[in-house]
Amino acid sequence: MNGMIEIHDFTERYLEDAAAIALRLWEAAIPGMPVEMRTRIYRYLVRYYYIPGSPLSLRAMENGKLCAFLLGAPASEIGSEHADKWMAGQLNGTEESVFFQEYKAYIDGNRRQEYLHAATNEASLLLFASIRRGAGKKLLEEFEKRCRSHGMTSIILWTDETCDFDYYHRNGFTEAAKFPADPTICDLKLTTYLFRKSVK
């Protein structure tokens, strides 16, 4: 039975629930990702984009359960090292370490492009996922409201073909740049897209 969707701050308590949502949505997004690493990769991904204390990170709850989340921060914040420290204790052997370094280089490279293209007073939409229809829209509306209240005038994000980037077209974002992903991952020919939206 569907209940009312409530929006709250995202906190460390919800990292594992968010990782489970990410795994559910993107488990097969990257062909070539070792099956045995998928759970750990998405647990890492959520930690990579979680910036403790950011007022721009949100969660959507329904009947007491996480149904969507949005991690955001001022674009001037490049992130923290807590995810790498966490992952260091999760890897088993050389093969896993090699794949992880390739994966990390891929997201680091795209995050760096987002950082370099960011404007003054811009917020980064870092990671966004929903398993409940309508919850994502509510999160995005609250995110935009919080961006304005914290002096942000626009939002930037990066995405690629493994995501539903048409969603951003449908919600008022415009394509700011696109280029071949460098480095790429698993020999995929991916394109990195940067999207931007004014929230003035």
Task: Please give the residue ranges for each predicted region.
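Conserved acetyl-CoA-binding loop-helix of GNAT-fold acetyltransferases
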Residues: 133-145, 170
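Conserved acyl-donor/pantetheine-binding loop and adjacent beta-alpha core of acyl/acetyltransferases
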Residues: 76-127, 131, 185-187
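Helix-loop element at the rim of GNAT/NAT acetyltransferase active sites that forms part
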Residues: 20-36
